[in-house]
Amino acid sequence: MRQKLEELLTAIQSPDRSLAIVAQAHLDDLTKPKGSLGCLEEIALSYVVATGRIKPVLERKKICCFAGDHGVAAEGVSAFPPEVTPQMVYNMLNGGAAINVLARHAGAELSVVDVGVNHDFPDLPGLLRRKVRYGSRNMSLEPAMSENETIHALMVGAELARDAALAGFHLLGTGEMGIANTTPAAALFAVLLDIPVETITGRGTGIDDARLNHKIAVIRKAIKVNEASLSTPLGTLAALGGYEIAAIAGFVLGASVCRVPVVIDGFISTAGAVAAMFLSPAVADYLFFSHLSGEQGHRIVMEKLARKPILDLDLRLGEGTGGALAMRIIEASVNVYNEMQTFSSAGVSGKTEE
């Protein structure tokens, strides 16, 4: 299993940054004052560099929502019971969740991926059954996943990204569903980005002060219990992560091999992206962070990564909802880049020199 991961990581290459010079010159020649479209120009330039195409294409979009259960839910860190995970998966498959609405209006295909739900799903349209295990272990007592299970989940995500690239999708998005998954996400941020546990840990699905303090204590205990496993990114992901978080990390890795940009959703998806960045720093150039999550600590994570999320709407749902919204902004940015006239082609006079 480890050899498969090494081969995947070796295949990831940094994009050609020289394309940024050509793309910036094109943006500056569009019929507008330089920089007047603000972040749209930055997004378009990043998309050109990531895809390696000076004439970028963005027509087909796909979101994969990865689902998994967490053993640490037994510690009472969430306001909702674990059985909500499969219930919400069924809701998504029936078209009733927020991500269904937002993905549809973004023109994005949606797949729900079972990588670790503690439930047996029948064959259903829109569901990809890729179960690694029936939920992770309780990370406050032992490692959440074994190394082989972690690599298995990573490869599930990577293979789905490659399949999407081969099917002709131009932009991918991440989503997740898993009761208690803000707990492993916060633990991963605390260790990988060296953020104090009390700073990074938030209220998740809306827990009160007493349960928040308990959640902080559980995360501290998990870090202490698994201390011997935290010397490497893979060991940290295995000890403190979850199957859907590992699959998101793999999704990022696989997409980066194929030079397909990925829109990262919120707090939990960012944990998967950060794990991928620690496994292969080159993936950073293929990522768009969709929004600043309402979950406590996400702003600090973005500052640590020196990244600016596209949207700030106080979203804290997950599922890929922020990613679906941001896809429309990215598409608008690419359309501006491709479809606006240039000063030279339109016969419009440029800015006069004073």
From Swiss-Prot:
It comes from the Bacteria. InterPro entries: Nict_dMeBzImd_PRibTrfase, Nict_dMeBzImd_PRibTrfase_bact, Nict_dMeBzImd_PRibTrfase_N, Nict_dMeBzImd_PRibTrfase_sf. CDD domains: DMB-PRT_CobT. It catalyses: 5,6-dimethylbenzimidazole + nicotinate beta-D-ribonucleotide = alpha-ribazole 5'-phosphate + nicotinate + H(+). Catalyzes the synthesis of alpha-ribazole-5'-phosphate from nicotinate mononucleotide (NAMN) and 5,6-dimethylbenzimidazole (DMB). It comes from Chlorobium phaeobacteroides (strain DSM 266 / SMG 266 / 2430). One of its GO terms (molecular function) is nicotinate-nucleotide-dimethylbenzimidazole phosphoribosyltransferase activity. One of its GO terms (biological process) is cobalamin biosynthetic process. It is an enzyme of class 2 (transferase). The keyword Cell inner membrane does not apply. The active site is at E319. Belongs to the CobT family. The lineage of its organism: Bacteria, Pseudomonadati, Chlorobiota, Chlorobiia, Chlorobiales. The keyword Cytoplasm does not apply. Its EC number is 2.4.2.21. This is Nicotinate-nucleotide--dimethylbenzimidazole phosphoribosyltransferase. Transmembrane segments: none annotated. Pathway: Nucleoside biosynthesis; alpha-ribazole biosynthesis; alpha-ribazole from 5,6-dimethylbenzimidazole: step 1/2. Keywords: Cobalamin biosynthesis, Glycosyltransferase, Transferase. Pfam families: DBI_PRT.
